[in-house]
Amino acid sequence: PAFGTTLIIEEKLRQIGIQTEKYNTTCPFVEKVWNRSEAIAKKNYSIIIHGKPKHEETRATFSHAANNAASVVVKDMDEAKELAKYITGEKDAANFYTEFKNQFSEGFDVKKDLQRIGVVNQTTMLASDTQAIADYLKQVMIDSFPNDNPEEHFADTRDTLCYATNDNQTAVSGMLQTDADLAIVVGGYNSSNTSHLVELCEEKLPTYFINNEEKILSAKEILHHNFHTKEELLTNDFLPAKYPVKILVTSGASCPDAL
């Protein structure tokens, strides 16, 4: 799959005779994250992964990262701030293993493995959120080790952010500066990056998340997905009673342009 897979699954495929290198469909941006994780691991940095702990891509990235270095997953800025408290010593190291249960690599040593870190992400997370987490943790390291060069404790991984996802997010943010009546977002209902675009639009406009043109039933009715509740909803009179109507349309990073 585009988001890659875990080393355990790769090994199972090899055991049954499937030559995975001949069928490699992993997104190059995901592989770039893996390669950078391996590179900074060789320099004795631990890997902080910004992602949804149960998402397939995050699980794959965690598997590859943990094979080379101590690794931990943070799902958002709130978790990053809690992780920072273990760096600064504000929290008892023993509590880490409960607070971040199932989100850290085997043998993770809180006192040792948070001295040198680098941040990578699930490529479909908001790039701005990942950058904010990286900037925050970098400042924590600077404050914690004021007499050292920042690079001694924090690896620069900015160039691992996926430009396809980042470009979409930046374009949508710019688009939302335009006065409009509603937004339609097209993409897969299980797509993480598309759901982030929906979130951006929902902050400003009535937003309808659809996966194909057939969901627009008429000028009056639209079937759309509520990704918060995982329900499909039918909305009547979704178009305002005015003319002209200004509609913002965007789509997820992997959505075919023809849609």
Regions found by a protein language model. Name each.
Residues 1-259:
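The feature marks the mature, well-folded catalytic cores of soluble enzymes
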